[in-house]
Amino acid sequence: MIKNSITNKLYVEAKKIIPGGVNSPARSFYFVKEIPVIAKRSKGPYIFDVDNNKYIDYICSWGASILGHNNYYITSKIIEYSKKGLNFGLLTEIEIKIARLISKYIPSIEMIRMVNSGTEATMSAIRLARSYTKKNKIIKFDGCYHGHADFLLANSNLDPYDLFSSNPISSGIPKNILKDTLICPYNDYESIEKIFDLYPNKIACIIVEPIAGNMGCVLPEKNFLYKLRMLCNKFNSLLIMDEIITGFRISLGGAQSYYNIYPDITCLGKIIGGGLPIGAFGGKKRIMNHVSPSGSVYQAGTFSGNPISMISGYACLKLLKSPDLYNKLNKKTEYLVNELRSSACDNKIPVVINSLGSMFSIFFTNLDKIKCYKDVSSCNYKKFILFFNEIKKLGILFSPSLFESNFITLMHKKKDLEKTIDSANKVFKILKNKV
């Protein structure tokens, strides 16, 4: 039985001093109409809340945790380095070490600039692309999230007479800021071709999640990424891959290595910080040399490349080269996903479960396939909400939004997966009778 007395009290206090009671909206669990989990500590695959409830965690810090929570090696390196100083506002050797390591693992990154968040990474990457190409228009995909910079916080305008234009998904964003942001459905190559036909000399870049992780887990159709690469080559536009979620999650070389399609600029975050705040963008030297102080594209930050995030990330990335690590992660995910599919089928609950590597999402739908934001938006919200809340009562913590992926870490053991499968089976039986 889940207890909530301390959680309820603290959440009331949080809402008095923090907008909505949280410092990032998804943490509020508003989508599932539930009070949030207020974490107290974590270890391995587990989260413990302030009421001492224990959860098997599949949020995994929104994908940032791949080795499990509170990894001893990483935390020991953080503690050891912090005795030298927390931040210097100067270049440190550890920045050079992690930059070299990332470049070694991801060959398309010949130079890299460290920042503090994914938003800073994508914002800076697009500024760089616009400067390098001397073009202004950018293409993003409906439902793909690339941070909260004004010109990226947009989805499609549904007006059939205003194709490819964008609507802000936040108040406070003037419409004219989005005049150069063009939106297409994910996996719809024909729409991209039409945009290039309309603006053949004006597209600075395409920014894409190689695997969409912010409308659940949605995979690219066969040759979709290849076609984007070829189109950018043809029109002298840059291809930016937002690998903030997929970088070091899908493979040691990211999704680009898995699909063998390489971008001009890559955005990274989450895993490369080893659990601490970080972001980065990198690419070919001929492009990256345009970044200040080498070039005219300005980017700066007091905490960019701060040594504590750098040592944390470096320690994490060193561990990821362990032989068979990704194979183990993938096998765990395949086992869990196959059993969840089987259980849903046995209970006559129509679902699509998308997965790749250690990412997965459960969609309650009668569709055969989920391949874009429109498909995700058509899914059965009521079933998702009921599933989330009922399985949470059993100590399983999935992502609290239909539009966020779930993740598995190296520390999820067979017993954790089996408990998750057994709990899901119980909840599918409830869904069968209730919805």
Curated annotation (Swiss-Prot):
Main location: cytoplasm
UniProt keyword Isomerase present: yes
One of the Pfam families matching this protein, by short name: Aminotran_3
InterPro entries from the UniProt entry: 4pyrrol_synth_GluAld_NH2Trfase, Aminotrans_3, Aminotrans_3_PPA_site, PyrdxlP-dep_Trfase, PyrdxlP-dep_Trfase_major, PyrdxlP-dep_Trfase_small
Example of a GO biological process term: protoporphyrinogen IX biosynthetic process
Known pathway: Porphyrin-containing compound metabolism; protoporphyrin-IX biosynthesis; 5-aminolevulinate from L-glutamyl-tRNA(Glu): step 2/2
Co-factor(s): pyridoxal 5'-phosphate
MF terms (GO), sorted A to Z: glutamate-1-semialdehyde 2,1-aminomutase activity; pyridoxal phosphate binding; transaminase activity
Catalytic activities: (S)-4-amino-5-oxopentanoate = 5-aminolevulinate
Presence of the UniProt keyword Electron transport in the record: no
Keyword field: Cytoplasm, Isomerase, Porphyrin biosynthesis, Pyridoxal phosphate
EC number per UniProt: 5.4.3.8
Residues with the N6-(pyridoxal phosphate)lysine modification: 270
Subcellular location: Cytoplasm
GO CC annotation: cytoplasm
UniProt family annotation: Belongs to the class-III pyridoxal-phosphate-dependent aminotransferase family. HemL subfamily.
Quaternary context: Homodimer.
PANTHER family assigned to the protein according to its UniProt record, in alphabetical order: GLUTAMATE-1-SEMIALDEHYDE 2,1-AMINOMUTASE, GLUTAMATE-1-SEMIALDEHYDE 2,1-AMINOMUTASE 1, CHLOROPLASTIC-RELATED
Protein name stated in the entry: Glutamate-1-semialdehyde 2,1-aminomutase
